[in-house]
Structure formats: C-alpha cells, structure tokens
Curated annotation (Swiss-Prot):
Name of the featured protein: Aspartate 1-decarboxylase
Species annotation: Vesicomyosocius okutanii subsp. Calyptogena okutanii (strain HA)
Name of the gene encoding the protein in the UniProt record: panD
Family: Belongs to the PanD family.
Textual note on the cofactor: Binds 1 pyruvoyl group covalently per subunit.
Residue numbers of Pyruvic acid (Ser) PTMs: S25
Keyword Cytoplasm recorded: yes
Organism placement in taxonomy: Bacteria, Pseudomonadati, Pseudomonadota, Gammaproteobacteria, Candidatus Pseudothioglobaceae
Amino acid sequence: MKRIFLSAKLHKVTTTAVELNYEGSCEIDGVLLDAAGIGAFEQIQIYNINNGNRFTTYTILGKDNSGIISVNGAAARKVNVGDVLIIAAYALYSEEELEGYAPRLCYVNNKNILTKISTGSKKSSLY
C-alpha cells in the first residue's frame, strides 16, 4: 500500500507578484525549488496564512536568487502581494520508502532568501 506524505515545504514565503491574466501556476525562485527538491511543473498546495485560502496549482521555475513568488491565473484571486504562504508538495510512499522518510523543510527570510533547510522529526509510529 502507498500513502501520501509531505515531501517538501517552503515555510512562510512572501508573495512578490500576482498575475491574473496568466495561464496559471506559481513561479518560484529556482534556488528555493532546488532546496526543497520540488520540480518545475510539479503539483503543489498553497496555504495563505493571511486569509486562510488553500489551493492546488503547479510550479514554474523562477530566476535563481530573485526571491520571486508569483501566484498566477485564477489563483491570483486568492492571494495579494505581501501575503505570507506555506507551499507544500506531497508524494506517494511505499511502506519500504517510509523507513527512510523525512520531508525537506525550507525556511526563508522576509525577502524569500533561503535561511535554513531541515527535515521533519519522526514522531509517528507510522513510519
């Protein structure tokens, strides 16, 4: 049996742009995507800390070290520039893969510059 677990999280990134008339997605600084192990065009969940909105979209590779977090298309109606977001990616894991499981947790400063990478603690008896 496979289960869905968090694979990576970008914690408290700040929205730098919203582009309503774009085909969709979320453009994210390439350094942040690499640090989290999230690929271009990978499905992500976005949780808006400011207003509680939660939605699904996919990533677009942004320029390295730009700090860009641009929410585009219809999702732009759920976010304002300056809103603080949690961006999460999930993956399917087999029981065997869960033995070595640890999500990548990436933290940034208020300019979306990476400050820390850690892994989740294993507090559950499930893995």
